[in-house]
Design a protein with these regions (language model features):
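Extracellular beta-strand scaffolds
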Residues: 3-6, 11-13, 17-18, 23-27, ...
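Binding/recognition "hotspot" determinant
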Residues: 70, 369, 379-381, 388, ...
Length: 534
C-alpha cells in the first residue's frame, strides 16, 4: 500500500503473510502464516500488532517504532525486528533459532524472550535496553548506547552472555552461561542475582569517571577465571556474597580471581575462594575483606595512608601484602599445602617502610617465612609452626611472638616490657631504600640486615640482632650474652680490674665467670685466700 495498512480482525494464510506500506501498519487481530513467513514492513511509519506467528520467519521492519501488544512466534526460524525508532514487546518473543532486535531508540521487552537453538540479540544504537527473562541456546548479546537493565534472568545454555553499555548495566536476576559472562559498561554495574559460568570466564569492566561495581549475588566460575576491572574510578562492593573461581590446580586459565582499580576507589567484599591465585590491586583506595582463600594471595594498595583490613586470609604457598597500613586478624595455611608459607610484605611504595602491620594469628602446617619486613610499628603472632623473618628493619617498635616466646625489636630508644627477648636494630645504617635489589632478594644474605628466626624447639631463637635483654631459660644463638648481662657484670666487685682480667698476659678468655686475679706481689708470704659462699 502507498499509505497505511490497518487490519481489525484475524489474518490467516496457509503460506505467507506479507504486508508492505509506506505509512503505518496496524494489525488489531492475530496474524498467522501457517507454513510460511509473516512479514510486516513500514517504509516510513510505525508497526503496531497483536499476536504474530509464522512457521518460518517473523520479520518486522519499521522506519519509526515497533510495538507488539501480543506474542511474536517463529516455529522453525527467526524473529527479526528492525526499527528506526524504538521497539516495545509487551508479551513473549519466541523463535526456534534467533531473536534479533535492532533499534535506533530504546528496546523494551516486557515479556520473556527465547531463542531456543540460536542467539538472542538486542541492540539499541541510540537508546537503552530493558528486558525481562532472556534465554538463548547460543549467545545472549545485548548492546545499548545508554543503559542496560535486565529485570529478570539472562541465560545462555551453550555459549556466552555478553552485555555492552554506553551507560550503566543493571541485572536484577540470575545471569548464567555455559561459557563466558561479560559486562562492559561506561557507567556503573549493579547485579542483583547470582552470576554463573560453567566452563568460561566471568569478566566485569567499567570505564567511567565513577564506575562503581556493586554485587548483590554470588559469582561463580565453575571452571574459569573471575576478572573485575575498574579502568578509571569506582568502588567494588558486595552484600555479603561469595566469589568462587574453580579450575585445575596450577592452571592460569581457570581457578583464578583478579580485581584491579586503576584510579580512586575502595574494595569491600565478603568472601573470595580460588583454586589457584587471588589478586587484588588498588591504585588509590582501601581494601576490606571478610575472607579470602587462594593458593597464592596478592593484595596491593599503591597509595600511602590507605588501609588494608582482612578478617581471615587462607593461602597455600605465598602471600603478598602491600600497603602502608596492614591489619589481618588471622592467616591460615591450606591443609593440603606442603612447605613453609612465604609472606612478602611491602609498603604502598616499596622504598618506604610499612607504617603499621598487625597480624593477630598465623597458623601453618610447618611454618611461615617472611622474605623481608621493613616497618615502623607492628605486631605478629604465630600460633603454630616455624617463624622466620629473613630480613628485618624496625624504625620504632614491633613485637613478634609464637606460643613459646615473645620478642620486641626497637629502632627507637628501647624500653623494657614483658617480652622474653628484646633487640635493637641500628636504623642509621643499611637503609633498605638505598639497596632495594638486595633487600628484596630471597634469603638472609648478604647479612646487612637483622634476621630473626624462632626455632621449633621452645624458647629458642636465632638472630644477629643487637640483643638487649633475654629472660632466664630463654636462648638466642649464636649470642651468649645480652646488653643487660654486660651491664650487670659491670656491677661486679672485680670490675675495677676489668682490663687486667680480660687483657693481662696469660688470661685470654673474655668473661672469666668471676675467676679471681692473682696478686703477683712477691712480698706477700701468704697466698690469697679464696672464699666461696653458697
Amino acid at each position: 500500500a502507498g499509505g497505511s495498512i490497518t487490519t481489525n480482525s484475524i489474518v490467516n494464510a496457509f503460506n505467507n503473510v506479507i504486508a508492505n506500506a509506506n505509512g503505518n501498519i496496524a494489525t488489531n487481530g492475530d496474524v498467522t502464516a501457517e507454513t510460511g513467513k509473516a512479514v510486516l514492513n513500514s517504509k516510513s511509519g510505525s508497526v503496531t500488532m497483536q499476536n504474530v506467528a509464522g512457521n518460518s520467519e517473523v520479520d518486522i521492519d519499521a522506519a519509526n517504532n515497533i510495538t507488539a501488544n501480543g506474542s511474536l512466534t517463529s516455529t522453525n526460524a527467526n524473529v527479526d525486528l528492525n526499527a528506526g525508532g524504538s521497539i516495545t514487546t509487551n508479551s513473549t518473543v519466541n523463535a526456534n533459532n534467533n531473536v534479533i532486535a535492532n533499534a535506533n531508540g530504546d528496546i523494551n521487552t516486557k515479556g520473556d524472550v527465547t531463542a531456543t537453538n540460536g542467539n538472542a540479540v538486542l541492540n539499541s544504537k541510540g537508546g537503552s535496553v530493558n528486558t525481562q527473562n532472556v534465554t538463548a541456546g547460543q549467545a545472549v548479546d545485548i548492546d545499548a548506547a545508554n543503559n542496560i537493565t535486565a529485570n529478570d534472568s539472562l541465560t545462555s545454555t551453550n555459549a556466552n552472555v555478553d552485555l555492552n553499555a554506553g551507560g550503566s548495566i543493571t541485572t536484577n536476576g540470575q545471569v548464567t552461561a555455559q561459557k563466558n559472562v561479560d559486562y562492559n559498561a561506561k557507567g556503573s554495574i549493579t547485579t542483583g542475582g547470582i552470576i554463573n559460568s560453567t566452563t568460561g570466564n566471568i569478566n566485569l569492566q567499567t570505564d567511567a569517571a565513577q564506575g562503581d561495581i556493586i554485587f548483590g549475588g554470588d559469582v561463580t566460575a565453575e571452571h574459569g577465571n573471575i576478572n573485575i576491572d575498574v579502568l578509571q574510578n569506582g568502588n567494588v562492593t558486595d552484600d555479603d556474597n561469595k566469589f568462587t573461581a574453580l579450575g585445575d590446580k596450577g592452571d592460569i586459565n581457570s581457578g583464578n580471581f583478579a580485581l584491579h582499580i586503576k584510579g580512586a576507589g575502595d574494595v569491600d567484599l565478603h568472601e573470595i575462594y580460588t583454586t589457584n591465585n587471588a589478586f587484588i590491586d588498588v591504585d588509590n583506595g582501601n581494601l576490606t575483606l571478610a575472607k579470602i582463600n587462594g593458593d597464592l594471595v596478592a593484595l596491593r594498595l599503591h597509595t600511602e595512608g590507605k588501609q588494608m583490613k582482612v578478617d581471615e586470609l587462607i593461602a597455600g604457598t605465598k602471600i603478598i601484602a602491600q600497603s602502608s597500613d596492614i591489619n589481618i586478624d588471622k592467616i591460615q595455611q591450606r591443609l593440603d599445602a606442603d612447605g613453609l608459607l612465604t609472606i612478602v610484605p611491602d609498603s604502598a611504595q616499596p622504598n618506604k617502610p610499612i607504617d603499621n602491620l598487625n597480624i593477630g594469628e598465623i597458623i601453618t602446617n610447618k611454618g611461615v617465612r617472611f622474605d623481608h619486613l621493613w616497618l615502623n610499628n607492628g605486631s605478629i603472632n604465630v600460633s603454630e609452626g616455624i617463624f622466620n623473618i629473613d630480613k628485618l628493619v624496625v624504625n620504632n617498635v614491633a613485637h613478634f611472638s609464637n606460643k613459646h616466646m615473645k620478642t620486641a625489636v626497637w629502632g627507637a630508644p628501647p624500653q623494657r616490657d614483658d617480652s622474653d627477648s628484646i633487640y635493637w636494630n641500628n636504623i642509621a645504617v643499611n637503609n633498605p631504600a638505598n639497596n632495594l635489589a638486595e633487600w628484596q632478594q630471597e634469603g638472609i644474605k648478604p647479612y646487612k640486615w637483622m634476621y630473626l628466626h624462632f626455632a621449633e624447639q621452645p624458647n629458642i631463637q636465632y638472630s644477629n640482632g643487637i640483643l638487649l635483654y633475654l629472660r632466664n631459660y630463654y636462648y638466642v644463638y649464636n649470642q651468649h650474652y645480652s646488653a643487660v648481662d654486660y651491664m650487670l657484670y659491670q656491677l661486679n666487685e672485680n670490675k675495677a680490674e676489668e682490663y687486667d682480667i680480660n687483657y693481662a698476659p696469660g688470661i685470654v678468655q673474655y668473661f672469666r665467670y668471676d675467676l679471681y686475679d692473682l696478686d703477683e706481689d712477691d712480698n706477700k708470704s701468704e697466698p690469697v685466700k679464696i672464699t666461696v659462699e653458697a
